[in-house]
């Protein structure tokens, strides 16, 4: 099993309960993947992860931390002596912005910030250049779970002010009549972090960044309107009159999603086909294009919910068992 992330742990438990020997390789120093270093403690207490890991160990799952498959251990070495390899490494290739000033110091992807903050809370050393919101004016670009996680962390660190910025129209309080099931409901979502503070901004387009001596000082943007959106559901933004904005900031966190799996050596060595969405292609039995190599979770589906990854991991484990039986 490559990765102790959500889907990997679920698949491991499914297989060990069927009598298979399972070893999970994790590149980080501790187990849990995004549960450990991505989701903040105020949403998920780490003792809950540790309790599940203790259960898995008691059931017979073996773990190896600090081992990155593809670098510390090649796929060929891994396949030698095992019947199946499962890739469950997630989808953490960041979506970026190509805007003027993007290179300025003070602009970071959200996940490195969340990882560092999780390590701080756990009393662990922080790796790489420090990313902190303490005493800073923060802008978070994005409007989903990750941006809310950044907001909660920034407030807890003692940020001077925090803006969560989204370019889409202000969501309605109730589901739109034109957006019926199974389409994703476009409604106002207020997370616990939003109730703690910060300012939420919609209909705000970021145009670039300004700085001094290589350091970020301002976010440049403009406000937009969506004429007829409430009646038609069609998004056609037009600049709002007098809507230019120059926002004084010290830290910008990009929480605008992910574009697929990371371009790791494990995928190059495995030969597993990667589709147009940047995720691993599989058949109905979770098998990749390489015999003996399977994949599941966000590595296949793209960034998704915790419960979805767990369900996918269990289904993958059942499919691998059926193949090996």
Language-model regions, residue ranges each:
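Short, small-residue-biased leader/transition segments that mark boundaries at the very start
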Residues: 2-3
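Rossmann-like NAD(P)H-binding beta-loop-alpha module
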Residues: 7-17, 123-159
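Glycine-rich FAD pyrophosphate-binding loop
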Residues: 18-36, 161-172
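Short hydrophobic core segments
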Residues: 25, 81-90, 139-141, 206, ...
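N-terminal Rossmann-like dinucleotide/flavin-binding domain of flavoprotein oxidoreductases
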Residues: 34-83, 185-205
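Conserved beta-strand-loop-beta-strand element in the redox core of flavoprotein oxidoreductases
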Residues: 65-85, 121-128, 211-245
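FAD-site-proximal beta/loop scaffold in flavoenzymes
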Residues: 103-135, 228-303
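A conserved FAD-binding loop/helix module that cradles the flavin
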Residues: 147-151, 157, 296-324
């Amino acid at each position: 099993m490559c990765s102790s992330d959500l889907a990997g742990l679920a698949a491991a438990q499914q297989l060990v309960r069927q009598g298979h020997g399972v070893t999970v390789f994790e590149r980080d120093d501790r187990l849990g993947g995004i549960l450990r270093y991505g989701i903040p403690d105020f949403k998920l207490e780490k003792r809950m992860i540790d309790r599940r890991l203790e259960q898995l160990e008691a059931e017979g799952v073996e773990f190896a931390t600090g081992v990155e498959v593809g670098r510390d251990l090649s796929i060929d070495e891994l396949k030698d002596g095992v019947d199946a390899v499962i890739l469950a490494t997630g989808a953490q290739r960041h979506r970026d912005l190509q805007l003027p000033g993007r290179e300025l110091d003070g602009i970071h992807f959200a996940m490195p910030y969340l990882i560092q903050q999780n390590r701080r809370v756990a009393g662990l050393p922080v790796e790489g250049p420090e990313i902190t919101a303490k005493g800073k004016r923060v802008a978070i670009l994005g409007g989903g779970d990750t941006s809310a996680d950044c907001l909660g962390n920034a407030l807890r660190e003692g940020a001077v002010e925090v803006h969560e910025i989204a370019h889409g129209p202000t969501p309605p309080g109730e589901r739109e009549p034109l957006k019926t099931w199974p389409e994703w409901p476009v409604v106002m979502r207020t997370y616990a972090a939003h109730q703690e503070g910060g300012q939420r901004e919609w209909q705000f387009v970021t145009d670039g960044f300004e700085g001094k001596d290589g350091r970020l000082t301002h976010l440049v943007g403009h406000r937009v309107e969506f004429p007829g959106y409430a009646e038609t559901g069609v998004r056609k933004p037009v600049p709002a009159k007098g809507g230019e904005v120059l926002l004084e900031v010290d830290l910008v966190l990009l929480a605008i999603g992910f574009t697929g799996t990371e371009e790791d050596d494990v995928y190059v060595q495995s030969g597993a086909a990667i589709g147009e969405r940047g995720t691993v292609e599989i058949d109905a039995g979770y098998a990749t294009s390489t015999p003996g190599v399977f994949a599941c979770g966000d590595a296949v589906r793209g960034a998704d919910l915790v419960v979805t990854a767990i369900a996918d991991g269990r289904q993958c484990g059942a499919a691998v068992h059926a193949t090996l039986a």
